[in-house]
A protein has these predicted regions:
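Extended, charged amphipathic alpha-helical segments
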Residues: 72-150, 155
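Generic structural signal for short, flexible, solvent-exposed coil/loop and linker residues
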Residues: 2, 31, 57-60, 130, ...
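A glycine-rich, acidic short-motif signal
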Residues: 1-104
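Residue-level signal for functionally critical sites in structured catalytic/ligand-binding pockets
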Residues: 6-11, 126, 184, 189
Length: 199
């Protein structure tokens, strides 16, 4: 069923990870990684009375196609951080920096980085984004990288190029029904170079 849903052409999935759902999140992340297309946002809630623990992410820390967001569960009861951040992010030009997402209406920022450096280090170790004040003035997402450390913008841009090239080559082949010969190969190379030149 997941493959059928995945094949419907989505670009992003947001999955809220509740306590006990970690195995599902890991499996979903590995699935998206294997497809090498699309982007998974995991939204993890944490217990405000305990130190954050993202150790379950160790199994998928090399996954490039998974972005993790997290807020204290008392501040994010409806898993709105990932959804709001993603909604704001996709309005921006392809390849924009995920860090500079701010003014998320339904998300309550951390109060002026009320966690210390050691607390923030737990987030940064796994490139987990939270919502906090930057320089005590502007609320922003604290991290714009996937689990493996690759920029979210780069991964989205990679998918954009892949989709555009695939669509244009497919259109050429369907509309022209060219024979398989050197001229057709050169035409396909020109299509690909055209997409890359205008990227």
């Amino acid at each position: 069923r997941l493959l059928k849903y995945y094949g419907a052409g989505f670009e992003y999935i947001v999955y809220p990870v509740a306590s006990g759902d970690e195995d599902v999140a890991v499996a979903l992340s590995n699935f998206v990684e294997e497809q090498d297309m699309g982007y998974l946002f995991l939204n993890i809630t944490t217990d405000p009375t305990k130190p954050v623990d993202f150790s379950t992410l160790d199994q998928i820390k090399d996954n490039r196609s998974t972005k993790v967001t997290s807020l204290n569960s008392t501040l994010d009861p409806n898993f709105v951080l990932a959804s709001n951040a993603l909604g704001k992010y996709v309005e921006q030009p392809i390849g924009s920096n995920f860090n500079f997402i701010d003014q998320l209406g339904e998300v309550q920022p951390q109060d002026r980085y009320e966690f210390g450096y050691d607390d923030l280090a737990a987030y940064e170790k796994y490139n987990v984004a939270t919502y906090a004040y930057e320089n005590n003035t502007t609320p922003m997402i604290t991290n714009g990288r996937s689990l493996s450390g690759v920029s979210t913008g780069i991964m989205v841009y990679k998918d954009y190029l892949t989709r555009t090239i695939t669509n244009r080559v497919t259109d050429y082949l369907v509309q022209n029904k060219p024979p398989y010969n050197a001229a057709t190969v050169k035409a396909i190379i020109s299509i690909i170079q055209g997409v890359l030149a205008n990227a």
